[in-house]
């Protein structure tokens, strides 16, 4: 996963507030996602770490990017635990997903993203912390594989 450091693109007049708040900084952040030569409509990387911030993730819909963000944070916690446990007991290392596993799970995630979305919407509605005055949009439809 690429790491982006805003310090590398600041100019002399930029405030050092860590905010991506102008087109030049936005272009620099967008460029770090890379160009996917096999799928030109998708970035090479869906998630980028930002020094001093956390991460940025992109997707084709609010549902998809929410899913990516949730599971990126969740999986990072699991990976940190695995690395700490491995270091504590002198294990053989953490086995990461292979290139084929990453590709195949990305394809699977493209259609499974809507499964947790409905549950998250209901949780937010029940929490009372959010009032949607626009109404509930229709549920997204999965593309048919006919």
Language-model segment annotations:
Residues 1-146:
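Glycine-rich flexible loops
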